[in-house]
Amino acid sequence: MAWALLLLTLLTQGTGSWAQSALTQPASVSGSPGQSITISCTGTSSDVGGYNYVSWYQQHPGKAPKLMIYEVSNRPSGVSNRFSGSKSGNTASLTISGLQAEDEADYYCSSYTSSSTLHS
């Protein structure tokens, strides 16, 4: 079972925004049913490292993205506790424990940024 990991692109104007930052995720992460995996999301002190506003989304093919984690480690109501978020320095992580077949999806991270630079 493998996941293609894509960067969520959120573009807005101005300084202090949910702008697209150069967040780096691994190209793919794989695991077997029952195992745990961790997906990293590395930014800078202007985004991931500077604010506790990292979110994670899950997207199945043909479906809208689903918010899984917000503000680094909070789960919305209805999201399984098999999903957990954390942050250390400029890197945020999403851990999925007890992998299940339905966890196969694209996972996206996003972060608030204080940078006024928009990356294309």
UniProtKB/Swiss-Prot annotation:
Gene Ontology cellular-component annotations: extracellular exosome; extracellular region; immunoglobulin complex; plasma membrane
Region (Complementarity-determining-2): 71-73
Cystine pairs: C41-C109
GO MF annotations, alphabetized: antigen binding
Region (Framework-1): 20-44
Domain named Ig-like: residues: 20-119
Sequence segments annotated as region (Framework-2): 54-70
Region feature Complementarity-determining-1, mapped onto this chain: 45-53
First-listed, main subcellular location of the protein, grouped into a coarse class: secreted
Sorted UniProt keywords: Adaptive immunity, Cell membrane, Disulfide bond, Immunity, Immunoglobulin, Immunoglobulin domain, Membrane, Pyrrolidone carboxylic acid, Secreted, Signal
Chain segments carrying region Framework-3: 74-109
Region feature (Complementarity-determining-3): 110-119
Residues the record lists as Pyrrolidone carboxylic acid modifications: Q20
Transferase in keyword set: no
Residues spanning the signal sequence: 1-19
Subcellular compartments: Secreted; Cell membrane
GO BP: any one term: immune response
Task performed by this protein: V region of the variable domain of immunoglobulin light chains that participates in the antigen recognition. Immunoglobulins, also known as antibodies, are membrane-bound or secreted glycoproteins produced by B lymphocytes. In the recognition phase of humoral immunity, the membrane-bound immunoglobulins serve as receptors which, upon binding of a specific antigen, trigger the clonal expansion and differentiation of B lymphocytes into immunoglobulins-secreting plasma cells.
Subunit description: Immunoglobulins are composed of two identical heavy chains and two identical light chains; disulfide-linked.
UniProt-recorded name of the protein: Immunoglobulin lambda variable 2-14
Organism: Homo sapiens (Human)
